[in-house]
Amino acid sequence: MFVLGWYMHELPKGGPKVSSFDLFDLGLFTFESSKEMSARSFYFLLHKSIGVTIFFLVLFRIYWRLTHKPPKMLTSMSAFEIKLATAAHHALYLLMFLIPLSGIIMSIGSKYGIHWFGIPFLPGIDNETLRDLFKEFHEIFGQILLLFFILHFAGALKHALVNKDGVLKRMWFHK
């Protein structure tokens, strides 16, 4: 979604209308649309559709997390590492919830609303103030999530390569 978000904002407004879209112009996958639209419109619609899907998957993940106990932290981890890991996980969950929510509210604030893979989902109310405010939230939360993801990845590498304490095994599907 980060790549898609950055890519779609670089596309010019009012480009030529077509019904075939080569994903990121890489020649790997082509989308066919039943109606002609600009590339910018297509990618915004795709981003919104995937974002709504992610929002509901995150809600399910949060439900799962609340109803299933996670594995215990390793005894080799210090109290500071346990607190840091817990705080990072809470931040990741919060951001995974806030990013699509802010995107949904931003889209409702626009005049276009949200179509989920072509199906009208939520109408827009054309409120520029609401849209602009939640656009800022959406972008800031996205950047913070990217930072937390990098830190989380670095922590996992540290445990795998330096500590060699089995944290990656704990994170995976092993019991």
Regions found by a protein language model. Name each.
Residues 1-175:
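Membrane-embedded alpha-helical bundles that constitute the cytochrome b-like, heme-associated redox core
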